Design a protein with these regions (language model features):
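Non-catalytic cap/lid and distal C-terminal segments of serine-dependent acyl enzymes
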Residues: 1-145
């Protein structure tokens, strides 16, 4: 049993890996992740550099698109600082929330007022993410699972 977590671009990676690999992970969490790289300037630039101009190919690396067609309903936990300087222009967690609701995919999105994109934000809530993963891993290890 495995769990995966990350921050910012690493949060994007955690979400994408969790959603693209059904059965590999028991839980996924992210701090301030990039959730829709195909819909933000930084992501468009990066996806073009790596994958070319085929926007359809980009969907395989976009958590908002992946959550719509995920075969496994892996619970997702996302914490986002309300004062993050990248919130509106690059991160846009509301897009993931909308996609998850539309797909019936479990997502707990917690907006944290007063927090930014920093280490202090992660340090403030990492214990809750560890508990999230521990609960999922424990449930997977129980004989009734």
């Amino acid at each position: 049993s495995r769990a995966i977590s990350g921050h910012s671009m690493g949060g994007h990676g955690a979400l994408v890996l969790g959603l693209r690999n059904p059965g590999r992970y028991r839980s996924v969490s992210a701090f301030s992740p990039i959730v829709a790289p195909s819909k933000v300037p930084w992501g468009e630039k990066a996806l073009t550099a790596y994958l070319g101009d085929d926007r359809e190919a980009w969907n395989a690396w976009d958590a908002c698109e992946l959550v719509k067609r995920a075969s496994e309903r892996l619970p997702l936990l996302v914490d986002q600082g309300g004062d993050d300087e990248f919130l509106d222009g690059q991160l846009r967690p509301q897009l993931l929330q909308a996609a998850a609701v539309a797909a019936g995919h479990p997502l707990q999105l917690r907006m944290r007022p007063g927090y930014d994109h920093s280490y202090y934000f992660i340090a403030s809530f990492i214990g809750e993410h560890i508990a999230h993963h521990a609960e999922a891993l424990h449930a997977a290890a129980s004989p009734s699972h």
